[in-house]
Amino acid sequence: MTTIVSVRRNNQVVIAGDGQVSLGNTVMKGNARKVRRLYHNKVLAGFAGGTADAFTLFERFESKLEMHQGHLMRAAVEMAKDWRSDRVLRKLEALLAVADTECSLIITGNGDVVQPENDLIAIGSGGNFAQAAATALLENTDLSAKEIAEKSLTIAGDICVFTNQFKTIEELNY
C-alpha cells in the first residue's frame, strides 16, 4: 500500500506521499507519484490503495471538480454519490485525501466523505504511524505544515514495510 499525509497549519496545506508500489510482498517501484495537483493547481490530492484504481478515481474526481468549478466539498460529495451507485467504482480499492485552501477531506472506499476535526489526514498502510507523528509535532512544535508532513512521512517509512523514503510533497499557501 502506501502512506499519504495531509497537514494544515498557518495558511499552508500540504499533502505528501511516499513512492512505493508493492505487489504482495514485492516492491515493484520505488518512485511513484501518488500526490497530484488538480483543477488549475488549486486542489491537492493523494491516493492510497491500488494504483490503477487510484488513477481511475483521480480522473473521475477531476471531472467532478471541473463540473463544480473547483468547489471541493461539492465535488467530493458528488464523487461519493457516484462511488456508491456505480458498479465499477464500488469495486475500486483506494482512498483519496484531498485539500484546497478551505478544507481537507478523505473520500473513502465506501463512498464516505470525512472532514477531519483537526485538518490532519493520514491514510494507507503507514497512516496510523504518520498520524501519530504528525499529531505530536502539531501539538509540541512550531514546525510548518510542510516540515510536519515530511517528518511524519519519514517516521512512517521507518516503521511500515509498505512505505519508503521517496517523497512527493505538494503545498498550497493562502
From Swiss-Prot:
Binding site for Na(+): 157, 160, 163
Coarse class of the protein's main subcellular location: cytoplasm
Keyword rRNA-binding: no
Keywords: Allosteric enzyme, Cytoplasm, Hydrolase, Metal-binding, Protease, Sodium, Threonine protease
GO MF term list: metal ion binding; threonine-type endopeptidase activity
Alphabetized PROSITE patterns for the sequence: PROTEASOME_BETA_2 (PS51476)
Subcellular location per the Swiss-Prot or TrEMBL entry: Cytoplasm
Documented EC number(s): 3.4.25.2
Cysteines joined through disulfide linkages: none
Record GO biological process: proteolysis involved in protein catabolic process
Function, as annotated: Protease subunit of a proteasome-like degradation complex believed to be a general protein degrading machinery.
Protein's UniProt name: ATP-dependent protease subunit HslV
Gene of this entry: hslV
